């Protein structure tokens, strides 16, 4: 064997050694990487805690993100504004076209007020809203210059008197002066709601426009606010069969929540203010109002309002006379029946009293049926006629409602008269019989009163007005559902926030809305932020801790859901957001303001639950629990 052969063999051994070492390293790496998985797969129940740990990794990730985010303190303007108070001037300007200045009452049968808030430089948008709405508005205007508010208020007066006739005609203007905070959106909303001239309020933002005739269409559906357990079966096709969440028991342990350390102060703040760029069409509005001369249009409205008022008053007087005649006839009949009862024995008297009660109950049921029949007639009218031709129908509906209320009152009076007459007539019987009859009457009255208190309280209902957005000019916005659907199908109009926050409006169920002909209830889910019509006497105020950008409508809708509101979508209604170039903001970025607002929301959610008897650590509407709230994973 020569030297060359030895060298070749040595190199082969060396290469083999290197190959073996490399192979060993690869095997070690594979075993290291696959080891935990193999252990879990082979260990069964014995490694269950490891499996659980892996499943909880996203949850742990959220908690870590929460902790990291919470370490970032809010800006100083947030904390400084938490306890700020504001100077307000309600009714700084009163609507000059729809209000009788002598009586301070509405001329026409307006029953719904748009409630909105704005700044002086965005009044043109609210004026266009008034031109389309043609009904009362309650507008809270934010005066940004707290050191020299007079100059900005003078500018406001000039705009109202000279530039925006529709705004001055329909709008009550309330002023809120800045206190160097972020934009106090919910303070402004509450100011406008408090001073609205009607109990029914429609929450709107200044960038939205309604179609013509929306006020009267909503008014035609007003009977949904009178749904009670006694007549709820008439609406079985419109309402969901909600199960009632179980309230918090006194024995439930809330220590986990009550021991949460961090409670932020009560108020918070933001600034929509300044340098908002608006589209040219908003700033150059055609005020001819449906191609009519403005003065001629307002004159026609006044004449129509006066005629409507006179007709409405005459109808009311006639109804009162009819009711009085009916009452007299009923009283005579009751007296005759009572006289006949005197000849009967004690058992017959009791039977007659029971029959009277049964008749009264039947009368009340008949009145409910009449209400429903009248309302169905209105539905037929709406389906056959244009949305703008409902004024007379609304008046008839309101008269019918008044008649029904009067009938109910008359029936109640007749009940009392029957009882009194029975008591007087029964004096001819012996003392024992009188006592028995009186006791029976009193017991029956008490039972009826208890039933009325338990059964006749209306459900809490809020109308959802479907919200859309578009880049098309406001002059091309549709005024009826058919045209609206065509524009949606052509992608010129789309549901609000469909690309950035699907959860914000998806509960509206836009696909169902396209085909719907009757109102339908939708199930609330966090983080729904609908534009709502509701009765302000049933509702809690907007939370004024929320100032600035973020969660102001979402949190309020959640509070309404917890308080038991039913959200009913009106099928022929819609509003359209007028998309415009991005606005510039003073102060923190929108992202920072949103995270600051979330600090408040994470208190609102459990607080509202506790207030209404629910466990704050139990999910009701897909909302985040306290330990997961400060995160963007739920929105």
Curated annotation (Swiss-Prot):
Low complexity: bias regions: 389-456
Residue spans, topological domain Extracellular: 39-635
One GO cellular component term noted in the UniProt record for this chain: membrane
Cytoplasmic side: 1-18
UniProt KW keywords: Glycoprotein, Membrane, Signal-anchor, Transmembrane, Transmembrane helix
Chief location category: membrane
Protein name: Glycosyltransferase-like protein gnt13
Organism ancestry: Eukaryota, Amoebozoa, Evosea, Eumycetozoa, Dictyostelia
